[in-house]
Every structure is written in structure tokens, then in C-alpha cells.
Amino acid sequence: MKPKFKLAVVQIRTETDKEKTFAKAEKMISEAAENGAELVVLPEMWNCPYSKKYFHAFADSENGESREAMSRWASENGVILVGGSVPEKCGDKLYNTCFVFDENGEQIARHRKIHLFDVDIEGGVRFKESNSFAPGEDITVFDTKFGRMGVEICFDIRFPELARAMAKRGAEVILCPAQFNMTTGPRHWELSVRARAMDNEVFFVGASAARYEGFDYECWGHSTVADPFGMVKASCDEKEQILYCDIDLNEVDSVRRQLPTFLHLREDIYNVAK
């Protein structure tokens, strides 16, 4: 039998006051752990408003404030902490980066967002993330006491090859910290979470920030967890809150027995993910 565990998505509303944001994050992670969560997921840019004018000011260098805090929160609460993402300064470059810490506070993974959000949607959102960040270069999978997992960040979800590559490397849970917006969120957010879960017969966790007003970029919220059949297992609205979901990894094997799509891959014809 494979493990069962409870996960929590901390759908936090980011503030311009960093101390206030950190205090909220610490409190919400502690609350999640007290309620039985063993894996806690923060959203994209949890420590920083999603705006070019804040990225450099809130950036973390190696052993920076955000990284130290996440390590401490993981160890103090005995949880695996998927640290959403923070602006990471490395040399003269800035990355949109997710750090993952085990229950002892040790860093076990780092994912730098591969696909940068450069869009200009007619009548909707305009953003050019590449004006601020450099793209990551690595597919990220990591082992936990529950099993192997993968992580991607927001716009990465639109590229199914990435999730497939993680699944082929053994990931049974894919975690996606994100901040979809008011243009793409209602159209594509739940659809994308369910599609990536169904495509790869994995649990897919879409961890959004809460909606906040007064910024140029307004977040959609609606954190969502989909099961290996592509059905919504847990979801919430746009407000600041903690979303809980019980995960049974035996469901992955069950679905793959019933619909053995990986056994029917025609890699003699196509091979888009290694």
C-alpha cells in the first residue's frame, strides 16, 4: 500500500509590508500543521506583490530571509513545505524560484520557472515577465517520505510536455504554485489543473495566491486539487484561506490500471518528453 497524507494550500494574500506577509504565512502554516497537514504548499510570489516594481526589492539571495524563514517553518511544524515561489537573486540574474524543504527544514529541491509569462491578451492582461526574470533550465522532481513529486510554476502549466516529463520520471504528485489573473483565471485555471492531472494520471495541486486589489496585476485565486482521473478533489474561492485535501497515492495506481495510457504510448512515432 502506498502512503496517504493530508496536504494544505496556503492561499495567502501578499502584502507590500513584508513583515506582515511573513507573520501571516507563519501563522497559516502553523494552523495547517495543527489541523493535520503534512505537506504545505505556498503560492507563486507569496512574499512579494506580483509586480515588476517589487521583484528586485523583495528578492532573496542565497540564505536570504525568505529561504531561512521557510526552512524554519518546515522544521518547527514538521511538514514538507513547498515554498511557492520568491524572486531569487543569483549573480546579476533574477529567477522566479520555488524552494522545497523537508520536515527537518532541509532544502530538497529548487525549481526555477522555465516558461516566463510574456503575454498581451487583447482586452485583458499584458505582462512581460522576461523583463524581470531569467528562465530556469531544469525539470524538477524530488523524493519525499510519501513518494516522488514534481514542481512547476504558473505559466509552466500551459506546456504539457513538462508535466509529462515529470510523470515519466516517476512523479505521482505535481505541485504548481501560481498566480493566474482575472483574464486567464476564469477561462483556463481549473481546466489546466484538471487537464494536467488527467494527461498524466497524477494528483495535480494548483496553489494560488488570494485575490488582492489595488495592484496592476489582480490574482484569480481559486486554488484547486485534481485527482488522477482529472476530477476536482478540493477547491476554494478567491479569499485568503487554507485549502485542505486528503491524498491517497493508491489512487494513482488504480487509475493507471483502469486506463493504462502509459502502456500505450507510441514513442516510435513521437517522443516529446524524456
Where are the language model's segments positioned?
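Short beta-strand scaffold segments in enzyme catalytic cores
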Residues: 83-84, 97-100, 140-142, 223-225, ...
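Cys-nucleophile CN-hydrolase/nitrilase-fold catalytic domain and related Cys-dependent amidase chemistry
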Residues: 15-18, 27-110, 119, 180-200
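Short, acidic/polar
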Residues: 20-29, 158-164
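Active-site catalytic loop in hydrolytic enzyme cores
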Residues: 89-169, 182-191, 257-261, 271
